[in-house]
């Protein structure tokens, strides 16, 4: 657990260590209602490629502390910056920071506000999300994107659903998805992120406008969007990525097609190889 000075202790999971690594360290940030372990497949590949890796449970998620407030983009980004400052003293200096979906928006905000802490950022099917373009009114967004009530679902049923919905995912992806839930003594699940906090995170994402800060970002940004029927806002995604290509000063795009929104869980080896290549070809220099 790391408290980076914001008063909330965040759980970290590590693979490899800086002393034995050859290449840039990596810090991995999950999406809304997800958790650090959904990165496990990619983290194992990163470590095998010579990177020291840390994945973080953001506030309210996984095994991190769960305050009742502080789920706006600024506060969550401050949490991550505080963790990076602690990690820097432990040998993880200026990592490449990857974030998925909501986490993609978080790392873009991080690159804007704290460029001195990162070598660059990777936005995985995120970093371009501007929910107000799709839902001008918050109430409309809150209804449309309200999560399903999974409380009380048997563990076995949930795992069976995951395996059926994602037949091409490796075991690390299924296990990581199951880690979104606390497993109760009666054999049922409870999401680590409560509905109330979920909606607070969603409100913070709805308020965030990453395109307004693109031109001011001074570190490299890699966008890794997913293309497919299950992608987020597939109809406007290419337009959003084109906007990023024309606005972010140092930018690269690596499309995964076809791919799920959680492409890092679905294709962990390929994802790790794409990011690793950018750490050795000079993009993240």
Regions found by a protein language model. Give the residues of each.
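Conserved HGGG/HGGXW glycine-rich cap/lid loop of the alpha/beta-hydrolase fold
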Residues: 13-63
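Flexible "cap/lid" loop of the alpha/beta hydrolase fold
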Residues: 108, 112, 119-153
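Alpha/beta-hydrolase
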Residues: 156-232
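N-terminal cap/lid segment of alpha/beta-hydrolase-fold proteins
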Residues: 1-9
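Catalytic histidine-centered segment of alpha/beta-hydrolase-like enzymes
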Residues: 256-268, 272
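Active-site loop/oxyanion-hole signature of alpha/beta-hydrolase fold enzymes
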Residues: 5, 48, 54-98, 102, ...
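Short beta-to-alpha linker loops that shape the active-site pocket of alpha/beta-hydrolase fold enzymes
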Residues: 42, 57-60, 67, 127, ...
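Conserved loop-alpha-helix segment in the C-terminal half of the alpha/beta-hydrolase fold
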Residues: 218-259
